[in-house]
């Protein structure tokens, strides 16, 4: 296997200039391991376009099709030259793949390049105007036809896609997201952890529900990290710290986030119900840091058969303030339950969701 290129939206190249132990490798999708094991491993990233015409054109196309075509941000000469020399292209999400598709589709169909894409939420049904629905299904069909491997981060979405697009199920693979367990590790005593943490920016998080929790738990200290939350959302409370930003902007370094996890007694992940495996990375990071996770039990949870309620995670049945308050208070009063879950959670992640396992499985998928 040679000439491998990873397609990212952004935020990776700049991190490669940082000291290796200063950032987690989670969102590189094992780029570092491929780089150390194979020759000619490259990265392409999105870059804002200066062309207002292109911006308007692809903005209209996105509106019309509901497909994430951001071609103006990635189809530049530099990236095209890299792709010309690429045999295996790994797109870390469908936005990257769709945005490259006008250039890669011919090379894919002629066997000059094998494109593998990580899927998250692409196949979910939503109510749309019938014209947009037709166009969306058309482009998804072309997407499935032209790409070699479609890699799902959630078993549930994989099963859903197999029913909806059964013709392409031979291209479908399941590979759960994994994290840098060498980075996400805690040396802090469980007894010294006392904060409640929330981390997350995807739109399947239930932010409106979350806003009501701190004021109803005034004796607990909350740390909330999200671009969708501000201090103004919690003006009525004095127990909430909000860090507004996203991973790619480096508002918070990975080391700083790790230190926040190290103060946390619990990690909250309230979700809206969907097939999307929302909260996956935060849950695994928390668990590796020995922070028990409270997560809404949704149909999109990525691998139910590996997790057990109250053994290595806490599945929350509903997003009501009363229910979550009762559960949180119960755990505060019974910290031995939290302690046991934190131990089991760390063990589960170390054994099943480390980057070495992810690398070996991804290598098998793209080699076939």
What is each residue range found by the language model?
Residues 77-85, 130-150:
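Membrane-proximal helix-turn-helix segments that form the acceptor-binding/catalytic region
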Residues 146-170, 181:
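A short, active-site helix/loop in glycosyltransferases that binds the activated sugar's phosphate group
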Residues 162-163, 173-193, 208, 234, ...:
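Acidic anion/phosphate-binding donor-loop and adjacent secondary structure
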Residues 188-205, 210-217, 223:
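Conserved donor-binding/catalytic core segment of Leloir-type glycosyltransferases
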Residues 201, 307-309, 313-321, 330-336:
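Conserved acidic donor-binding segment of nucleotide-sugar-dependent glycosyltransferases
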Residues 226, 231-261, 266:
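Nucleotide-activated donor-binding/catalytic signature segment of Leloir-type glycosyltransferases, i.e.
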Residues 259-276, 291:
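Acidic donor-binding loop of glycosyltransferase active sites
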Residues 323, 330, 337-352, 358-364:
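A short, well-ordered alpha-helix in the C-terminal region of glycosyltransferases
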């Amino acid at each position: 296997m040679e000439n491998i290129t990873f397609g990212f939206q952004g935020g990776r190249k700049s991190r490669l200039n940082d000291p290796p132990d200063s950032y987690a490798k989670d969102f590189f999708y094992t780029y570092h391991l491929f780089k150390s094991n194979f020759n000619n491993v490259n990265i392409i990233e999105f870059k804002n376009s200066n062309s207002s015409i292109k911006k308007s054109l692809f903005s209209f196309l996105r509106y019309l099709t509901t497909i994430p075509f951001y071609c103006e941000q990635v189809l530049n000469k530099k990236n095209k030259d890299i792709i010309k020399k690429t045999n295996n292209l790994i797109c870390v999400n469908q936005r990257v793949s769709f945005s490259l598709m006008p250039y890669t589709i011919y090379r894919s169909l002629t066997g000059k390049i094998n494109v593998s894409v990580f899927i998250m939420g692409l196949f979910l049904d939503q109510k749309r105007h019938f014209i947009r629905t037709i166009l969306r299904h058309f482009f998804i069909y072309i997407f499935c036809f032209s790409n070699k491997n479609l890699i799902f981060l959630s078993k549930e979405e994989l099963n859903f896609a197999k029913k909806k697009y059964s013709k392409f199920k031979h291209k479908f693979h399941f590979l759960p997201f994994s994290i840098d367990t060498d980075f996400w590790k805690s040396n802090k005593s469980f007894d010294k952890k006392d904060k409640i943490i929330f981390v997350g920016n995807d739109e399947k998080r239930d932010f409106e529900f979350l806003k009501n929790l701190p004021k109803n738990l005034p004796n607990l200290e909350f740390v909330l990290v999200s671009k969708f939350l501000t201090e103004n959302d919690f003006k009525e409370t004095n127990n909430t710290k909000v860090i507004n930003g996203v991973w790619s902007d480096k508002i918070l370094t990975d080391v700083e986030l790790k230190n926040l996890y190290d103060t946390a007694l619990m990690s909250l992940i309230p979700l809206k119900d969907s097939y999307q495996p929302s909260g996956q990375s935060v849950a695994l990071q928390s668990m590796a840091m020995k922070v028990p996770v409270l997560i809404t039990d949704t149909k999109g949870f990525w691998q139910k058969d590996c997790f057990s309620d109250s053994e290595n995670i806490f599945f929350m049945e509903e997003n009501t303030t009363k229910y979550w308050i009762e559960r949180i208070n119960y755990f505060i009063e019974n910290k031995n339950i939290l302690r046991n879950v934190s131990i089991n959670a760390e063990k589960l992640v170390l054994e099943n969701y480390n980057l070495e396992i992810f690398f070996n499985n991804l290598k098998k998928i793209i080699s076939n």
